[in-house]
């Protein structure tokens, strides 16, 4: 699966999308925990970099809740009725509901350095591949157990 390109703000106006690598790095890992795009409503200051609005951030977070297993309760968001941010993406829900999570991250330049920051929609193929791998492992385990 090809990594999506981050859409957002460039640090230098001379940069273009062609200067950027696909989305990679540790920002992807923070999304698994529920930080970043999953909790867009909790970080209004980040909205300017992603070219987003409060309404879009609320929508992103609600969509993330629809495809997540639960919510963190240790960090309630006051302007979101004190709800926690979504955690635990469920690949079955992502594929079944066709709701693709939005991830926040930095934009790495092909020649090195940071080009900007923003958001990227995670490709559905990542989730389909994960489900196929789990299915394959489950079948192998079942055959081994007899």
Regions found by a protein language model. Name each.
Residues 1-146:
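Anaerobic metallocofactor- and corrinoid-dependent redox/one-carbon enzyme cores
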């Amino acid at each position: 699966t090809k990594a999506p390109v981050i859409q957002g703000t460039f640090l230098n106006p001379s940069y273009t999308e062609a200067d950027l690598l696909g989305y990679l790095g540790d920002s992807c890992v923070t999304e698994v925990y529920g930080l970043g795009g999953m909790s867009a409503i909790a970080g209004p200051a980040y909205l300017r970099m992603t070219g987003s609005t409060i309404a879009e951030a609320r929508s992103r977070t609600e969509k993330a809740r629809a495809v997540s297993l639960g919510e963190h309760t240790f960090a309630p968001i006051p302007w979101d009725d004190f709800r926690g941010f979504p955690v635990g993406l469920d690949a079955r829900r992502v594929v079944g509901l066709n709701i693709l999570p939005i991830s926040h991250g930095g934009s790495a330049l092909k020649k090195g350095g940071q080009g900007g920051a923003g958001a990227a929609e995670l490709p559905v193929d990542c989730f389909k591949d994960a489900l196929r791998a789990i299915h394959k492992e489950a079948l192998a385990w079942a055959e081994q157990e007899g």
